[in-house]
Each structure stands twice: as C-alpha cells, then as structure tokens.
From Swiss-Prot:
Residues 402-416 have a biased composition (Low complexity). One of its GO terms (biological process) is regulation of transcription by RNA polymerase II. It is found in: Nucleus. It comes from the Eukaryota. It comes from Clogmia albipunctata. This is Protein hunchback. InterPro entries: Ikaros_C2H2-ZF (IPR050589), Znf_C2H2_sf (IPR036236), Znf_C2H2_type (IPR013087). Keywords: Developmental protein, DNA-binding, Gap protein, Metal-binding, Nucleus, Repeat, Zinc, Zinc-finger. Residues 1-77, 229-270, 318-361, 398-422 are annotated as: Disordered. A zinc finger (C2H2-type) spans 87-109, 116-138, 144-166, 172-196, 432-454, 460-484. Residues 16-37, 257-270, 345-358 have a biased composition (Polar residues). One of its GO terms (molecular function) is DNA-binding transcription factor activity. GO terms for cellular component: nucleus. Pfam families: zf-C2H2 (PF00096).
Length: 485
C-alpha cells in the first residue's frame, strides 16, 4: 500500500463528497453488514479479502485512511512506558503485537454465525456495540468530548477513564507498599503480581469509602459492591440500621405488655425463643440493608430454621404452662392486686388465709397455700404461729420443673431461690452451626458473617481475598488474623 499520494482537484472533491456521506448514520441489515446511504451498491467482502487492506476506486477510501490503517493495524507500537504494546487474548494465552494478528487469532474463538465483520478493515467481533464503536472511528464520529481539553472519544467509558487524568486523586492504593493508581484494573494487576492486599478505596473527592471493595481475582470491572443512594446522596446503610434497631426495640417492648395482659407466667427461656424470628423480620422489612458484602443469603431459609426450632421446643413449653394452669385451678383463693399485697401478711385472721405473691416478678414455683395458725389465749392446745424460717424453707424447696430442650443432651431444672435470684437456663445450642468448621454460633448475625467468608466452589477458599487454606484450622486462623477491607 502507498503511504502518501499526490492529491488532485478531482480527488479533493471526491474527499468532500466522502466526508458528507460518512456523516450519515450507519445501519446494519440481517447479515450484520454496514450499508451507506449512497448511490453505489453495497456489497459484502469475502473472508479472504478481509486479510488484505481494502482497495477501492478512490471514491470510498483515500490515501490518508490507507496510511492510518498501516500504522494502526500492521505496525507494532510503543506505549508511554517505552515498552511494546501487546494485545492479550481473553480466551487463551495468545499475545499479539499488532492488531491485524490479534484479529486473525480471534477468528478461532468466534463462531461463524456470531462473527461481525467490518467492511473497511479486517476487524471482527461478536459484539454489536464493539462494531459500532469501531465504525465511529472510521467515520471520525466521536460524540463524547472532554470539557477541559480537546479530547473526544466514541463511548462514555473512555471519557470517564480520560477524566481521571485531570484529577490529582489516586483512588486505588496498595496496602503493603506505596503503589497508587487512578485505575482499578491497574491495582488488580499489581495485587495479583506481588500478592499484596487492597486497602480502603477512596471516592472521587479523596474521602475514604469503606463500602467499596476490590475483588482482586474477579473479572468484573471496578469495585465489587455498589450501594444505592437517596435524594441527598447519602448511603442508605445507616438509615436502614437505625430502622432495624427501632423495629427490633419495638418488638421487644411489645412482649412484656402481652405478658401483663394475659397474666400467664412465662419461663425466661421462652422469652429468648420468642426473639428468634426478629432477625429475619428485620431483613424482610429492610431488604436494602447489606449484612455482608461477600454474601447474598436467602433469609427465608434462616427464618425456616428458626420456625423449625420453635416447633420442636413449643410442646415442652406448652406442657409446662398447662401444669402451671392446673396448679392455679387447685387453689380456690384468688390473688389480689399485686400493688396492694405485701410480701407476707402475718397479721391476718385465721379465717382469711394469706397468699404469697411477688410485686415485681411472677411466681416461678408450684402454687400452694400457707395456713397460719394463731395461738388462742382461751384454750391450752399449744398451737403456735409458724416462724418465718419455716415458711421460707418451704418456699425454697418446691418440686423443680424440668424443661427439656431438644438441642441439649442434658436437662437443666429451673430452681427458684428468691425474688432477686436469676433462673439459669442452659442456652440453645446448634441452632446456627457451620458444618465446614464445626463451630456453633448463638447469634444468627455472627453465623452469617462467618459463612460469608467461605467460598462457593471451595469452602476453604476465602471469599474476601481469594486465599486458599488447607483445612478448617488454617481457614479459621486466616479470617481471624488477616485483615479484610
């Protein structure tokens, strides 16, 4: 091909006509071949012709396009760092130094029915938008222009990348060295090459953004996690957490009111069990609240596990409550208002037996009647009033009530000692258990965070940084000692 040719007046007029035609939009037909709105019939080129530069009669392509084609396609280039520019194949390990050899190699990876060809050069692709951007380069159409300089490009992505050259903020930095760059892809290459760790990502204004995470071994461009913003431009994370806290506190306040209205003694273990579904309800009410950036759990599964645990424990609780109701029916006397009753009334008449009640706490042991006998001055039967120590000894030795939990191997009796003593109940076990590490969690949030570190394909591969561990011990030490941004 010739590099530069002598121009004639006829050729100048033909070039003006060509530029006018190139300004018209390009449409594609069913065969994905571009057609110009001109008087000449468009034709598709054979595959053999694609390997050679396009040579026409001068009315379609001028000498400048031929020279540009030689420079861009056939000649290797040197980048800004003084190294030869290479083109790497994403499907294999092939590396080319010219566009022409790279396009010829891509033919083996693209199916014939999906291959899109350019009529003006050997360019091929399987994506329509790539062909559209390529044709814009041929036409000289670059609608995206920089407002700070004369730079123009064919798509928005290239403009966004160019705008970083006008900024002095290096958003992406290395945690283990002084490496800093403006581009996420460059940081990923650095981290993979030297096995370094990524720190916190900066915003465009230089402020730290803990919500954006670098997926070192991922193929997707940019940070992995994005958060929606409200009208004011603030992240919805804090508002969702506050909303969940308010809803959770509202549910906690509703349980004591329910107990007071029903006057049903509830064991402390049932209060803890009643709080189990709150976590799943919080995430159902606030679906946009992110729990862990590496995990997308189905919280309906957690709710189903909680309901299954409650269904197994509920028969034991119902039996305990039925036994309490039967004991209350055996007592003919009704309890008075707790506000008016004292702890123990020793001045009552023999005909009016007094009952033992609690002002702040409900009765936890079996209900029974205390008969107080007053000594009579008229007879000599020797009846004496029971001492307070005897009454207290009877209160301290009721028949213990056992609540069997299906998740524990042994049963723990509920022993009542006094009003201020707390009832010890063995906590629920194995509700949230990691089968990979053989670790149990009492709280669903801790269990969810832990499971987020397990990989999808390899359970002992860290989902945060990509490090692969040998066994459960090495994996646990890794997530406990190594910092994850």
């Amino acid at each position: 091909t010739s590099s530069t040719a002598r121009k004639t007046p006829e050729k100048d007029s033909l070039k003006q006509d060509q530029n006018q035609l190139l300004k018209t939009p390009i449409q594609t037909n069913g065969n994905q071949q571009s057609t110009f709105d001109s008087g000449e019939d468009s034709h598709s080129m054979p595959d053999s012709d694609l390997l050679e530069p396009v040579i026409t009669d001068g009315a379609d392509v001028d000498d400048e396009n031929d020279a540009e084609e030689d420079d861009d396609i056939r000649t290797p280039k040197i980048n800004s760092h003084g190294k030869m520019k290479t083109y790497k194949c994403k499907q294999c390990d092939f590396i080319a130094v010219t566009k022409l050899s790279f396009w010829e190699h891509n033919r083996i990876h693209i199916k014939p029915e999906k291959m899109l060809k350019c009529q003006k050069c050997p360019f091929i692709t399987e994506y329509k938008h790539h062909l559209e951007y390529h044709l814009r380069n041929h036409n000289g159409s670059k609608p995206f222009q920089c407002k700070q300089c004369n730079y123009s490009c064919v798509n928005k992505s290239m403009l966004n990348s160019h705008m970083k050259s006008h900024s002095n903020i290096y958003q992406y930095r290395c945690k283990d060295c002084n490496y800093a760059t403006k581009y996420c892809h460059s940081l990923k290459l650095h981290l993979r090459k030297y096995s370094h760790n990524p720190p916190m990502v900066l915003n465009y204004d230089g402020t730290p953004n803990p919500l954006r995470i670098i997926d070192v071994y991922g193929t997707r461009r940019g940070p992995k996690v994005k958060f929606h913003k409200d009208e004011g431009g603030h992240n919805l994370l804090n508002s969702n957490i506050n909303t969940s806290r308010r809803s959770k506190s509202g549910k906690r306040d509703s349980f004591p009111n329910f107990e007071q209205s029903q006057h049903v003694p509830t064991p402390p273990s049932s209060q803890a069990l009643a709080m189990l579904p709150n976590l799943a309800n919080i995430f159902q009410q606030s679906p946009s609240m992110p729990l862990f950036p590496y995990l997308n759990l189905n919280f309906h599964h957690i709710l189903a596990q909680q309901k299954a645990a409650l269904s197994q424990i509920s028969p034991s609780i119902n039996g305990w409550q039925n036994e309490e109701n039967c004991n209350e029916e055996e007592t003919p006397e009704k309890e008075e208002d707790p506000k008016r009753m004292s702890a123990l009334d020793l001045s009552s008449n023999p005909s009016t037996p007094s009952t033992v009640s609690q002002v702040k706490h409900k009765r936890k042991g079996r209900a029974f009647k205390l008969e107080l006998m007053k000594e009579s001055s008229d007879d000599d039967e020797g009846q004496t009033i029971r001492t307070l120590g005897e009454i207290r000894s009877e209160l301290e030795t009721p028949k213990p009530v056992q609540l069997q939990l299906p998740t524990s191997s042994t049963t723990t009796p509920l022993k009542t000692t006094s009003e201020d003593d707390s009832t010890s109940v063995e906590p629920l076990q194995n509700l949230y258990e990691c089968k990979f590490c053989d670790i149990s969690f009492k709280h669903a949030v801790l269990y969810t965070i832990h499971m987020g570190y397990h990989g999808y394909n390899d359970v002992f591969k860290c989902n945060a940084c990509g490090k692969k561990c040998e066994d459960r011990v090495a994996f646990f030490l890794h997530i406990a000692r190594d910092a994850h941004a």
